[in-house]
Design a protein with these regions (language model features):
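Signature for phosphate-centric chemistry
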Residues: 2-17, 21-219, 223-265
Length: 265
């Protein structure tokens, strides 16, 4: 509608840049997108490393770290739970934890019978911040997120909602609660301002260069939900919740769109 490209356009390499992290799923997603975006053009999907090797531009790892950085990062993360701190973050997820555990029949699971995991009741989340590594955590939020990820994928892939929930009758609100765990996990690890600016810096630098590249009309960067979480936090994007989605922050297939307009005005 804006006249950026004509129908059946075949843009030059300078006009379009399709750049993916070198993970297999990112390369595939970029190819699928490009086929639909410019179906008659032979557009190269650029990635820099052998498949399944993380590209530093998309790798949300801590590039600089110090004791003062750790202290401030942990404070900012704890502030997400209000006066109750880290424990408060988990307490606010109590209902979501219970729905997820019930859906998985966690108390009757092999993990529980082996004494490994019977409930998501370890609220003392441990945050691990190391130079050159992604922010990590230990505790129930981590365990529940692993389960939430799997269930949400199943929700999208399985047409039968009851089958997706292992025979349980889950409401849309129940699924939203399960998905909320993943959203909170992303915020805790990547959305604290001091952490977001740190881990998103390589990608933000690349984005800045793309927005200022001579002759560039369109750039498509294909990464991960952690990239969206850190970039939006680093740019101080106002809080939002997506409508008509059980995932309110970074659903599968979500995109951040940045437009640059130039003219006499």
């Amino acid at each position: 509608d804006a006249g950026l490209f004509k129908e059946n356009a075949n843009p030059t390499k300078d006009e379009v840049n399709i750049y993916a992290n070198s993970m297999q799923r990112c390369i595939a997603t970029a190819r699928y997108f490009t086929t639909a975006f410019l179906p008659v053009a032979d557009i190269q999907v650029n990635h820099r490393y052998v498949p399944s090797k993380m590209d530093p531009v998309f790798f949300p790892r801590l590039t600089k770290i110090s004791e003062s950085f750790k202290k401030e990062a942990l404070k900012q993360i704890a502030d997400m739970g209000g006066k109750r701190g880290i424990r408060g973050i988990n307490e606010d997820l109590k209902k979501a934890y219970e729905i997820t555990a019930s859906t998985l029949d966690l108390k009757d699971s092999p993990a529980c019978k082996e004494g490994k995991l019977c409930a998501f009741d370890n609220y003392n989340t441990e945050i691990l911040l190391e130079r050159g590594e992604e922010p990590r955590m230990k505790g129930s939020l981590k365990d529940a997120t692993t389960c939430s990820d799997a269930l949400i994928l199943q929700y999208y892939e399985e047409p039968d909602a009851k089958k997706a929930a292992f025979g349980h009758d889950l409401s849309l609100e129940d699924w939203t609660q399960i998905a909320r765990i993943k959203d909170v996990y992303g915020d805790v690890l990547f959305a604290a301002p001091i952490v977001a600016v740190n881990v998103a810096h390589p990608l933000l630098t690349y984005m800045y260069d793309e927005l200022n590249a001579k002759g560039r009309k369109f750039s498509f960067l294909c990464g991960h939900d952690s990239n969206i979480a850190s970039v939006t936090a680093a740019l101080d994007v106002e809080p939002y919740e997506l409508p008509n989605s059980i995932e309110k922050k970074t659903p599968i297939g979500s995109k951040v769109v940045i437009e640059k307009f130039e003219g006499k005005d």
